[in-house]
């Protein structure tokens, strides 16, 4: 596995643990179809949350959340709709969030949660 992939997987694990620590219940990870992937699917209260995780080792190339372009947000919206078509929407609202993780390998990674990006 390439270092970039390892860093991304580590960031997703950090984000998943952070969500659980903040009361979210994980219901899926790395849901893939031909057109893309949803990193984390979770529930908080009556909201199903679809989470895109972006991880960077440093900010030399910008903050991780800067990687969420309008095109990526549109793709996430389409993936969320496809997930709902596949599994049926759960009761309550839907939301798409982003989590940026910096220094994922450190004992204290920086986590930035941005709810409702689409």
From Swiss-Prot:
InterPro entries: Restrct_endonuc-II-like (IPR011335), tRNA_endonuc-like_dom_sf (IPR011856), UPF0102_YraN-like (IPR003509)
GO molecular function, one term: nucleic acid binding
Family per record: Belongs to the UPF0102 family.
Protein known as: UPF0102 protein Lxx14785
Species in which this protein is naturally found: Leifsonia xyli subsp. xyli (strain CTCB07)
Lineage: Bacteria, Bacillati, Actinomycetota, Actinomycetes, Micrococcales
